């Protein structure tokens, strides 16, 4: 008996795989739907077309799910932001109120202090004026005019000379 070579069965199986008695004009599932019967269609082709369409649908579903998750995340961020907007405004208003109140009190104290200083200065000048007036009425020379013995120039002489 003749022993077949080991490469011959492989060659026969390769030829059998290459030779397809089925129709290959089918490119999509829509082409399959147009056929009356699936008897002449290669089951591997049907499986491949179904897998391709399933992959397309899965990728579309994943994209839709990602968009939905992204929109939900944006809504959650906006809601989280809304939770902090009102307290932030309240904090800003309260802090500005307290700052302005403190600043007003500080200005008021500074004003009062300056007013007391000026009042003391006015009192000192008033006393000096009163003493000068009293000295003038009593006939004495005022204490202010230490070098006042010289007569001042008349104003019209300054224009002429």
Swiss-Prot record:
Residues 108-161 are mitochondrial intermembrane. Keywords: Chaperone, Coiled coil, Membrane, Mitochondrion, Mitochondrion inner membrane, Transit peptide, Transmembrane, Transmembrane helix. The chain crosses the membrane at residues 85-107. Residues 1-22 form a transit peptide. It is a single-pass membrane protein. It is found in: Mitochondrion inner membrane. It comes from the Eukaryota. One of its GO terms (cellular component) is mitochondrial inner membrane. Residues 23-84 are mitochondrial matrix. Component of the inner membrane assembly (INA) complex, composed of INA17 and INA22. Interacts with a subset of F(1)F(0)-ATP synthase subunits of the F(1)-domain and the peripheral stalk. Component of the INA complex (INAC) that promotes the biogenesis of mitochondrial F(1)F(0)-ATP synthase. INAC facilitates the assembly of the peripheral stalk and promotes the assembly of the catalytic F(1)-domain with the membrane-embedded F(0)-domain. Belongs to the INA17 family. This is Inner membrane assembly complex subunit 17. The gene is INA17.
């Amino acid at each position: 008996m003749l022993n077949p070579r080991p490469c011959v069965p492989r060659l026969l199986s390769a030829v059998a795989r290459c030779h397809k008695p089925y129709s290959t004009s089918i490119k999509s599932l829509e082409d399959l739907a147009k056929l009356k019967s699936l008897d002449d269609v290669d089951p591997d082709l049907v499986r491949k077309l179904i897998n391709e369409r399933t992959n397309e649908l899965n990728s579309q579903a994943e994209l839709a799910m990602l968009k939905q998750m992204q929109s939900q995340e944006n809504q959650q961020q906006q809601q989280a932001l809304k939770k902090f907007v009102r307290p932030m405004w309240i904090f800003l208003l309260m802090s500005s109120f307290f700052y302005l109140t403190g600043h007003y009190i500080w200005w008021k104290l500074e004003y009062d202090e300056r007013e007391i200083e000026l009042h003391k200065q006015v009192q000192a000048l008033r006393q000096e004026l009163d003493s000068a007036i009293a000295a003038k009425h009593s006939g004495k020379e005022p204490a202010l005019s230490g070098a006042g013995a010289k007569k001042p120039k008349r104003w019209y002489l300054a224009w002429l000379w």
